C-alpha cells in the first residue's frame, strides 16, 4: 500500500502545484503552455492536455489574467469544459469560449474579424481568443490568444509554442482566423 500512498501524495502535491498564482506576478498576461508538466499529462477527453488542451489553456490565460486568480489553471478549465459538455472528438467547442469565461465571472462576446476592432479592444485591455486553421500556428485547428497591440503589431500567445509567441502584423495571420472572442472584467 506504500506505492499507492506515494501515488496519492504525488498527485496531491501536483494539484497543489497546479495553481498558477505565481505566473500572474506582473501586469502582463502569462504565456501558459498546454504541455507544461504541471498539467500536460492530465487527460482532457481521450487525449492528454499536451496534445489537445489549447482551448482550455487559452481560456485559462485570459480568465486568470483578468481575475488575477491562479485557481483558473488550464486543467481547471479543461475539467470544466469536459464536465459541462464542451469537449468532443473534434476538440473544444466554440461555445466554451463564451460560457467557460462567464462561469468564471468574465464577460465574453464574439468579435468580427476587423483589424481596427481588434486594435480597439486590445488597447482597452480586452484580450482576444482566436480559433485558427492551418497556417503559422497549426497543421489542423488551434486556439491562440491576442493579448496586446503595440507599434502596429499584435502580441500572440500560442499555448503550444514559446517560439511562436511574439508580435505579428495582422496580415501575417488574419487569413487563418476562423473566429474570435473578446473578454472583459466588466460587462460589454
Region annotations inferred by a language model:
Residues 46-55, 69, 89-93, 110, ...:
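Extracytoplasmic/periplasmic, Sec-exported soluble proteins
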Residues 55-63, 74, 78, 94, ...:
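Extracytoplasmic/secreted envelope proteins and their assembly/folding machinery
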Residues 10-27, 32, 149-188:
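Noncatalytic regulatory segments and standalone regulatory/sensor domains
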Residues 82, 102, 122-123, 174:
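Alpha-helix boundary recognition
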Residues 72-73, 79-113:
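Mid-length scaffold segments of soluble, non-membrane domains
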Amino acid at each position: 500500500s506504500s506505492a499507492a500512498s506515494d501515488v496519492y501524495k504525488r498527485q496531491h502535491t501536483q494539484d497543489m502545484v497546479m495553481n498558477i498564482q505565481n505566473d500572474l506576478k506582473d501586469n502582463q498576461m502569462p504565456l501558459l503552455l498546454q504541455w507544461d508538466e504541471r498539467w500536460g499529462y492530465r487527460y482532457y477527453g481521450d487525449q492528454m492536455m499536451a496534445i489537445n488542451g489549447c482551448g482550455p489553456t487559452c481560456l485559462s490565460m485570459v480568465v486568470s489574467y483578468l481575475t488575477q486568480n491562479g485557481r483558473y489553471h488550464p486543467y481547471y478549465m479543461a475539467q470544466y469544459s469536459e464536465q459541462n459538455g464542451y469537449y468532443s472528438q473534434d476538440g473544444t467547442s466554440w461555445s466554451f469560449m463564451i460560457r467557460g469565461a462567464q462561469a468564471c465571472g468574465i464577460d465574453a462576446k464574439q468579435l468580427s474579424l476587423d483589424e481596427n476592432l481588434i486594435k480597439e479592444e486590445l488597447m482597452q485591455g480586452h484580450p482576444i481568443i482566436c480559433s485558427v486553421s492551418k497556417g503559422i500556428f497549426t497543421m489542423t485547428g488551434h486556439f491562440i490568444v491576442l493579448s496586446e497591440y503595440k507599434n502596429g503589431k499584435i502580441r500572440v500567445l500560442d499555448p503550444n509554442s514559446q517560439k511562436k509567441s511574439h508580435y505579428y502584423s495582422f496580415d501575417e495571420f488574419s487569413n487563418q482566423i476562423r473566429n474570435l472572442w473578446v473578454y472583459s472584467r466588466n460587462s460589454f
